[in-house]
Amino acid sequence: MYGDLGNKLVQHAKRTQNLAHLPPYQTEIVRAVTREVRDLDKDVGELLEPFQGSFDPSADQAVSCTLLVNHLSMRRNKRCLLAYHRTRTDKLEEQVWNGSDVVDLSGQQVRDTSNSGTGSSGATSSLSPQEEEYVRQYSDLLAAYKGQWTDIDLTGSLEPPRDLFIDVRVIKDAGEIQTEYGAITLTKNSQFYVRQGDVERLITQGYLHKLG
């Protein structure tokens, strides 16, 4: 039935709003919905072709009703596509503002899902190629915007830290970083007592885990 696939996209979008991560892009459903729109548009053209631009809705109500249903179905599919993609871009922008490496996280999610035996074997990222490009350009735009105020971290947390120094455990290797008190090398499973402001971004990005 017309609109069923579009409704599936809306359901995916609704679930996405309640998730901390971005689920895999529904490529096949998106393609099926756009294909349905093209088919409906083709049907409309074929219905109107015999009338040569002189169609009178009141004179042929059966054709008029078919055209209305097709038109409303196309509009609904378009709104479902827009809602699905808007939800995902909002989530992507939120992650960029939080300082997350979105492309790396999406790849890690797919690898974790594949290792658990529930993912698709060919996927390498939960983002579509267009979303990956969008994230790159949005990140560049945000970096240029932040560059105007070098003394203020616009993406920093609005909540003041309760503790100046915290204990952290390294979740994945992050290499050497410079802190106010010197350089430290972050290797997996190591633990440090550091100033929170020096590692807050690494915690957000998933490299470190705050203890206590």
UniProtKB/Swiss-Prot annotation:
<comment type="similarity">
    <text>Belongs to the GINS1/PSF1 family.</text>
</comment>
<keyword id="KW-0539">Nucleus</keyword>
<dbReference type="Pfam" id="PF24997">
    <property type="entry name" value="PSF1_C"/>
</dbReference>
<comment type="subunit">
    <text>Component of the GINS complex which is a heterotetramer of SLD5, PSF1, PSF2 and PSF3.</text>
</comment>
<dbReference type="GO" id="GO:1902983">
    <property type="term" value="P:DNA strand elongation involved in mitotic DNA replication"/>
</dbReference>
<dbReference type="InterPro" id="IPR036224">
    <property type="entry name" value="GINS_bundle-like_dom_sf"/>
</dbReference>
<protein>
    <recommendedName>
        <fullName>DNA replication complex GINS protein PSF1</fullName>
    </recommendedName>
</protein>
<keyword id="KW-0235">DNA replication</keyword>
<feature type="compositionally biased region" description="Low complexity">
    <location>
        <begin position="113"/>
        <end position="128"/>
    </location>
</feature>
<dbReference type="InterPro" id="IPR021151">
    <property type="entry name" value="GINS_A"/>
</dbReference>
<dbReference type="GO" id="GO:0000811">
    <property type="term" value="C:GINS complex"/>
</dbReference>
<feature type="region of interest" description="Disordered">
    <location>
        <begin position="107"/>
        <end position="131"/>
    </location>
</feature>
<dbReference type="Pfam" id="PF05916">
    <property type="entry name" value="Sld5"/>
</dbReference>
<dbReference type="InterPro" id="IPR056783">
    <property type="entry name" value="PSF1_C"/>
</dbReference>
<dbReference type="InterPro" id="IPR005339">
    <property type="entry name" value="GINS_Psf1"/>
</dbReference>
<comment type="function">
    <text>The GINS complex plays an essential role in the initiation of DNA replication.</text>
</comment>
